[in-house]
Amino acid sequence: MARQPTKKSGSKKQKRNVPNGMAYIQSTFNNSIVTITDQNGDVISWASAGSSGFKGAKKGTPFAAQTAAESAARRAIDQGMRQIEVMVSGPGAGRETAIRALQGAGLEITLIRDITPIPHNGCRPPKRRRV
């Protein structure tokens, strides 16, 4: 006799009501990643330019960062988020557009902080490109 297929007991995402949290925008030259967390740092939603459907060099564009930020913000608003503090990291092109996209999606931004790590003369940087 054939065995009945058993359901896997995976953890189902429950909808929690989180009114305010933090948004971390990591913007490099090659990609942009937007992570939205609650006050404790537990991830509520995230999106990147790659997960939004962009490939190759297009991932580093401001439009790709905007699309990723809108996607992450939409999922956070579904969880009940209203206010966020924005932490921006990295030298990429999508920094400002991602912040504007979060604001345009309906989230109220209470703080913007640049947390880009700056060395106090640490590692030697890569050599300059000669094209």
Curated annotation (Swiss-Prot):
Keyword rRNA-binding recorded: yes
Any GO MF annotation of the entry: structural constituent of ribosome
Keywords: Ribonucleoprotein, Ribosomal protein, RNA-binding, rRNA-binding
UniProt xrefs under Pfam families: Ribosomal_S11 (PF00411)
SUPFAM superfamilies per the UniProt record, alphabetical: Translational machinery components
GO biological process terms held by the UniProt record: translation
GO annotation, cellular component aspect: ribonucleoprotein complex; ribosome
Superkingdom, natural source: Bacteria
Family named by the database record: Belongs to the universal ribosomal protein uS11 family.
NCBIfam families the record matches: PRK05309.1, uS11_bact
Subunit structure: Part of the 30S ribosomal subunit. Interacts with proteins S7 and S18. Binds to IF-3.
The protein's role, per its UniProt record: Located on the platform of the 30S subunit, it bridges several disparate RNA helices of the 16S rRNA. Forms part of the Shine-Dalgarno cleft in the 70S ribosome.
Protein name (record): Small ribosomal subunit protein uS11
Organism expressing this protein natively: Nostoc sp. (strain PCC 7120 / SAG 25.82 / UTEX 2576)
